[in-house]
Amino acid sequence: MARSDYLFTSESVSEGHPDKVCDRISDTVVDAYLAEMPEARLGVETLATTNRIVIAGEVRGPDSVTFARLEELTRAAVKDIGYEQDGFHWKNADVAIYLHAQSADIAQGVDASGNKDEGAGDQGIMFGYATDETPALMPAPIYYAHKILKDLADARKGRVGEAAKLGPDAKSQVTVRYEGGRPVEATQIVLSTQHLDESLDSQGVRAIVEPYIRAALPGSWVTDRTVWHVNPTGKFVIGGPDGDCGLTGRKIIVDTYGGAAPHGGGAFSGKDPTKVDRSAAYAARYLAKNVVAAGLSRRATIQLAYAIGVAKPLSIYVDLHGTGRVEEAKLEKVLGEILDLSPRGIRTHLGLNKPIYARTSAYGHFGREPDRDGGFSWEKTDLVATLKSALA
């Protein structure tokens, strides 16, 4: 029997975290190619360290996207994040680009030809999850860990009061107490943030960030019992890639559900939407969110599995965690009928062949508001009526 009273913790990292800098750059490259050629293929990895950025990977796209243009976009991304420090500066960092053509062996398995539909770009398993414990149908710990950092980043970049003294690199962690299976209280709050003023100590930083943290959390969640850990090492001036080397794809739990749901292991950033690590994970979230939004369950986990070069998923698995109002086996059948879960079908339905990915690189790929230009389309709940009708 599932526990109903427990503590659960999730963490988030800011857009200035070294790994997130790399995710942002990799997705900036993806967007640059998709803007010129919606069918472009990319697998782009980025490394960032002290005043050096290395971009490498495989590309099939137009020659109009030059390395000079990619360097310009990379510097603009780093500038937007806020890095203008001696050890990592958008203007002075060395940018090296090593992109080459996609493997023909991979392309032949993925490309559509004759009667063969477009196949998956790789094998793998992908999970989607939704829960009714927040308005965004996301687990509360990761949802609020993201919100804290996003609000602080907005204040820092907008130079709002004392928040202007903060740097781009930050991490948050929220421990939530559940009672009767519902989130009711934040028992522990961890916030480490870079600061530009070397005279600031932990108390000084807490004075800056605490109002934003309290505003981000539900009003009753912060109590006299809540334990705070703000910059517990005392000083955090050297940050970002100058303090720790960053790599694309190292924050896959931050990107998804904060550990509250399984993860298939594949990262998202730097990949075009033919790669099911990304597109099928988005589709699984889309399905799970619509299941919960339709009132068919309070929680839903969906797994999809693929083989390279094969169009249709090998399996669909649904777990409603004992909260369902419909048989899981029936739902598994219906989900495969109401949405074409081939790579092409997912990309077409969700409109994924667009430059919409740089914005996903920080503060979570899920639990976001859909954008008018098609960004975060997998967060829509437009399958609710179709689901209900198919199950009637």
UniProtKB/Swiss-Prot annotation:
Annotated localization: Cytoplasm
Subcellular location, principal: cytoplasm
Pathway(s) of this molecule: Amino-acid biosynthesis; S-adenosyl-L-methionine biosynthesis; S-adenosyl-L-methionine from L-methionine: step 1/1
Names of the cofactor(s): Mg(2+); K(+)
TM segment ranges: none
Enzyme Commission code: 2.5.1.6
Annotated region (Flexible loop), positions in chain: 102-112
PANTHER family xref list: S-ADENOSYLMETHIONINE SYNTHETASE (PTHR11964)
Protein name: S-adenosylmethionine synthase
The species this protein was found in: Methylobacterium sp. (strain 4-46)
Classification of source organism: Bacteria, Pseudomonadati, Pseudomonadota, Alphaproteobacteria, Hyphomicrobiales
